[in-house]
Amino acid sequence: MFAELNAKDQFNELLKHLSSTSCTTMQADRVETSSSVRKKKWMSRRRGACDMCKSKKVRCDGGTPCSYCNLHDLRCEYQLSKKQQTNKPPVASAAEDVSIVPSYAENNGSGVTTQVPSPSDVQVLPELTANRGSGNAGNILQDMMLATNDRHSMPVMFDGYAHDNFSASPIEWVGSDSLAAPFSVDMGNLNALGTLPWSPPKTAYSEPNLDIPYPIEHTTDVSASLPSISQFELNLPLSPAGPTRDMYDEKMWEEVSPKRQRLGNLSPTQQDEVEAIFRRLSDAQSQMSFGLGGEQYDSHSRWYWSDTALMEKCKSACFEEPLGISTFLTRSHFDDYVQQARESPSIQGLAVRPLIDSVMAFGFHILAARSQPSAGSDVSRKAITRLRMALSSRDAVQRSPDTLLKLQMTISEQIDHKIHTELLSYAVSCARSRRFLHRDSVYMTMTKEKEYLARRSMWYLYSMEVVHSIRDGMPPILTPDWTDYALPEVGKDTDTDWLLIQCQHANALSSAVNALYSPRALCQTVAERERNMMQAHKLLENWRTSLPVHLQNIHRHETGYVALDDQKTRHLTLTMVGKYHEAIFIIFFPWTGSQSKGLISEHYRKRSMELCVKSAQAVLAIAARITSCDILGGSLAS
């Protein structure tokens, strides 16, 4: 027999009630309201009634005078004309869960109800605080949230802030402008990017879903904690699964960044909070912009794309380098990528362009290394910067061909050890799911060239992962039998296949580690351990003697046995020197100290010490030649 109170009318009467009643009465009302759900519903139905109605426990609908006031020819303090109600926008349904900030009503001395315009901001909060004896604005706002009926209920926002598991899903920011469109981003054109660390916001009115496992810092300024004029809607469920580098690039950030979008009349504090939510979605932003200086990320290919001559120089330097890219990517295959990017730049942009950027950056880095010191330090810094620019698209590794995976690992090895480790993990996971088995349907649709490159790419990954894991003191993940294909044979264009040489070195190193440092090896007898030690040394020496003739003396420390005059082959020579002496250190150095007593005989301990000393002498001799003054003239004295 009694209609439910309108949510807007209840809000107006609540403000009036807060300013007209004493602190003791308000405290009692709050306790009485939160005591039970049933009592709160009973209070909310007659909270808007005047004092006379309350004294008689008469329920007042707030729109027309109650029966008691009509009977005694009185006027309700909460009365509003029907004309004023029809001119207001309708209250949203419960499914939409949209609440409108109402206008404030006050009663003048003559008993006539007047309408006070609602402020556009929440600067009325200090006045509300002054009317409360405790001065706790947060409690006032809780009362405001509780002062609703059961149909148009508003959640208590401030209670959720006290928990670490912050969930703002029941919160909706609403202002007085009911026609304001919610903030949304049209990301329909980004569907081809693969799995992103967020779901695109919806473009229609819907219930927000902000389930972010990060506590949000809240300011003590209550005026910055309430919504302003326009409605703000986010639908960004964050998936905690996946690698930590599930990233987006700078161009995506420019599209979804709140600073680049109109957020209505949100306060600066609220805008900072929204921006912090976006930045918490990924920690990639700082790493992608690291080392770029003033360069624009979305134009990191501009330095070479319009310069055909520079592209040819970088490409030639990249594929002339016997180690790295040329071991698993042919120049003709790369030329097809370049032509595809020029003819249809939007089709394979995420896969082809990062590949081209990486090859160009790697080639420029080689050119800069060859021209030193005549080129100066500026060229060297520019080469490092361009390598970092190519690395900034490394999140595309998960959605790129396998060739790009290994390519970006090669570049990252020159720059950042941490990034290199992460890319190796991505590549191993990807390669294990695509092992190019004979039973795989993809194998039947592969061209001969792509099948050849796929095999070499997987073995190149093996050669990198084994050495990298052992350097970090971890057992290798990949083994020589991890794929159905045998080791690559001699390359097509040269008698020396450097990929085969790298894989043989990885095999020798992995075999030595398993024979000497595995859990089973630690339980061996002294004779078995010494036999395995000599067998590991024999495998390493067999690898050294299989190198080209000019590299077979990398174990000697005498001057003249290692040629470093040629700038084009110096990096290759030093790489082979490093691989050999690093293996000597891994095999023998742990047995040179007193801690090996009882594990090997004294003869083998001294033999290990002798090999390590000779290895150190050879490395120091080469380092002295490199750092000598002769290198400043562009050549090294033999």
UniProtKB/Swiss-Prot annotation:
Keywords: DNA-binding, Metal-binding, Nucleus, Transcription, Transcription regulation, Zinc. Disruption phenotype: Impairs the expression of the terrein gene cluster and subsequent production of terrein. Transcription factor that regulates specifically the terrein biosynthesis gene cluster. Recognizes CGG direct repeat consensus sequences in the terrein cluster forming the high affinity consensus motif TCGGHHWYHCGGH. GO terms for cellular component: nucleus. One of its GO terms (biological process) is positive regulation of metabolic process. Its main location: nucleus. Residues 50-76 bind DNA. This is Terrein cluster-specific transcription factor terR. The gene is terR. One of its GO terms (molecular function) is zinc ion binding. PROSITE patterns: ZN2_CY6_FUNGAL_1, ZN2_CY6_FUNGAL_2. The keyword Plastid does not apply. Induction: Expression is induced by methionine. Nitrogen starvation induces expression of terR and promotes terrein production during fruit infection, via regulation by areA and atfA. Iron limitation acts as a third independent signal for terrein cluster induction via the iron response regulator hapX. It is found in: Nucleus.
